């Protein structure tokens, strides 16, 4: 099964594609960040996220997608921007007929590190450790969070399948 994880953001949207087999192994196929820095109009940023994700989706036979849920923080403007980026990401995935699953950042962190309050550095460390990614391979926080979302979905899917047997 091939899963794309998405960490939405208006300036930086992270993505990571993992492959999971029945033998319980998971490997990272690719990851990256869609940057909209230098684009001033919000509508153009959203379009770039949408088109860029479509491009990534066309490279792989994605079975399912996992995306981080939006949380509302104390800054309404940044929360709205995050919602827009998430919508652009969701529409890209849904337009390809791919089922999308949503997880809160707390649920993803708990699944990956054991603590829903884990700092980004701990999430990144556990993502690298789980997938055997060497320290000299550069993966920024946005990609790491997206890969964590994909891993969270893999682990949750396995637990559901195990419970059904």
Swiss-Prot record:
Required co-factor(s) are: Mg(2+)
User: Does the entry annotate any disulfide bonds, and if so which pairs?
Assistant: none
| Gene Ontology cellular component annotations, sorted alphabetically | cytoplasm; Holliday junction resolvase complex
Per UniProt, Mg(2+) 2 binds at: 68
Q: Where in the cell is it found?
A: Cytoplasm
Which of UniProt's keywords are assigned here? Cytoplasm, DNA damage, DNA recombination, DNA repair, DNA-binding, Endonuclease, Hydrolase, Magnesium, Metal-binding, Nuclease
State the Gene Ontology terms under molecular function.
crossover junction DNA endonuclease activity; DNA binding; magnesium ion binding
EC number in record: 3.1.21.10
Question: Which note does the record give on the cofactor?
Answer: Binds 2 Mg(2+) ion per subunit.
| Signal peptide (from-to) | none
Q: Which GO terms describe its biological process?
A: DNA recombination; DNA repair
> Which reaction equation describes what this protein catalyses?
Endonucleolytic cleavage at a junction such as a reciprocal single-stranded crossover between two homologous DNA duplexes (Holliday junction)
Q: Per its UniProt record, what InterPro entries does this chain match?
A: RNaseH-like_sf, RNaseH_sf, X-over_junc_endoDNase_RuvC
The annotated active site, in chain numbering, is: 7, 68, 142
The residues the record assigns to binding Mg(2+) 1 are: 7, 142
Note the superkingdom of the native organism: Bacteria
Q: What does this protein do?
A: The RuvA-RuvB-RuvC complex processes Holliday junction (HJ) DNA during genetic recombination and DNA repair. Endonuclease that resolves HJ intermediates. Cleaves cruciform DNA by making single-stranded nicks across the HJ at symmetrical positions within the homologous arms, yielding a 5'-phosphate and a 3'-hydroxyl group; requires a central core of homology in the junction. The consensus cleavage sequence is 5'-(A/T)TT(C/G)-3'. Cleavage occurs on the 3'-side of the TT dinucleotide at the point of strand exchange.
Name the protein family.
Belongs to the RuvC family.
This chain's protein is named Crossover junction endodeoxyribonuclease RuvC
Record gene name: ruvC
């Amino acid at each position: 099964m091939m899963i794309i994880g998405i960490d939405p953001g208006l300036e930086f949207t992270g993505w990571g594609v993992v492959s999971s087999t029945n033998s319980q192994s998971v490997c990272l196929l690719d990851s990256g960040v869609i940057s909209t820095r230098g684009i001033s109009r919000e509508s153009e940023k959203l379009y770039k996220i949408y088109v860029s994700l479509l491009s990534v989706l066309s490279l792989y036979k994605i079975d399912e997608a996992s995306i981080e849920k939006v949380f509302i923080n104390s800054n309404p403007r940044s929360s709205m921007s995050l919602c827009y980026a998430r919508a652009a990401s969701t529409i890209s995935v849904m337009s390809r007929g791919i089922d999308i699953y949503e997880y809160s950042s707390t649920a993803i962190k708990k699944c990956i590190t054991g603590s829903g309050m884990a700092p980004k550095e701990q999430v990144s460390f556990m993502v690298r450790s789980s997938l055997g990614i060497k320290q000299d391979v550069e993966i920024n926080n946005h990609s790491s969070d997206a890969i964590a979302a994909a891993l969270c979905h893999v682990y949750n899917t396995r637990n559901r399948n195990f419970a059904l047997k």
